[in-house]
Amino acid sequence: MSKILITGASGFVGSFLVEKALELGFDTWAVLRKTSSKEYLTDPRIHFIELDLGNDAVLTQQLSEHAAQHGAFDYVIHAAGATKAPNEAAFRRTNTEGTLRLARTLLDLQLLNGRFVFVSSLSVVGAVAENPIRQADGTVAQGLDRYRAITDADTPQPNTAYGRSKLDAERALATLEGLDFVTLRPTGVYGPRERDYFLMADSIKKHIDFAVGYTPQALTFIYVRDLVDACFLALQRGERGRSYFLSDGEVYDSRAFSDLLQQEMGVKWVAHIKAPVWFLHAVCQVSTWISKCTGKMSTLNMDKFQHMRQRTRLS
């Protein structure tokens, strides 16, 4: 029976990764913190392990003790990470340094027999395709064709602290000699247990559709179970050291997305409210300032502002 280590196991994606690992017959080890919830991790076949990805000495001791009793891992899926943080340094500590520390320690202790799959993000690309496309007559293209699609050929230019921390993690992994790894860059992930898209659905349920900007926004998504399937395929497939974008292959207009939510939930009417980008910028600035003062992260912050104002899509 192959042995797999899954980080971020108590999170949205991580809990589904654990379920899939058990379904496929893996000897499954779920990484948790002392404060982590086990709400979706109740299967008695799950083995739990506490790892401190923020401390070299502690992590080395924890993995060494594990190895003495249970041996090495055959595979690792690293899905842990911070999507919200008070500042860029905090993002780097978790997403960049934590990722590098885990992979490096596994290599140093010879505790990884197979592949390391890193769950990164589309956010590493940034706003690389934000200039409107002009048609032969000089006019700007309309609708979802207004901006060109993001492709593998684009050089990443992340415009958020989160995106920069994930890209730096990708680059850090590439410096580790002997590491067999693949990076997955999913677009927006939706499904049961997810909270951010739930907030949008809840807003529609309350008859309000709030949008930012007056030009069309192209949205791309991937269902959580499809992302999970891709993670397990990547254990065996994919070019070593390569990054792969993941989506369901469709492009959605932001209005069409809200209309779909309205239809599926049976909401009879919705007030569609559009706010200028400058207004969202002001709200996110204030929200970020309050978060710094209180120490509590808000869904609306300057990183989220960059994400919400972006118009582009995957090819």
Predicted regions, residues:
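N-terminal Rossmann-fold cofactor-binding loop
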Residues: V31-S36, L53
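Substrate-positioning beta->alpha
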Residues: R164, A169, E194-L199, G213-L235, ...
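Conserved Rossmann-fold NAD(P)-dependent oxidoreductase catalytic core, especially the SDR/UDP-sugar
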Residues: H78, L100-A161
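N-terminal Rossmann NAD(P)H-binding glycine-rich loop of SDR-like oxidoreductase domains
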Residues: I4-L24
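Mid/C-terminal beta-alpha module of Rossmann-like enzyme folds, strongest
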Residues: A234-L300
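NAD(P)H-binding glycine-rich loop region in Rossmannoid oxidoreductase-like domains
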Residues: L51-E97, R101, V124-A127
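Active-site Tyr-X1-5-Lys
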Residues: L144, R148, Q157-V182
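Flexible, glycine-rich beta-alpha linker
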Residues: V124-G126, V182-L199
